[in-house]
């Protein structure tokens, strides 16, 4: 279904409202890092990935709700200028659990560790100390999988 906008300002307002759910929290020479707070933002910024919370089928809402139930925070790293960070990955998802643990995924939905992501040393996420987070892929067997 195509949406027709009566005026350009209507389109601009629509785009701004969708972006309100994804906040740019850090920008480096390589990355733009977004805090993702809604399913709509996850689908928009996670486009062209295999992340279950960013897909276009009906299951993405289920997975999103399961993660939210656990109080998980989502951050998407998106490369600038098509910089190829690792193989073909230009996007990474980082989930933060209780500001103690993390899981990270490449575009193909494979687990990665933070130190495997080029340029992660320059990434600053407000309120999160990436250096002290422990890698804990808890959701492989215990619950939903990103």
List PLM regions with ranges:
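Catalytic-core elements of nucleic-acid end-processing and repair enzymes
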Residues: 1-146
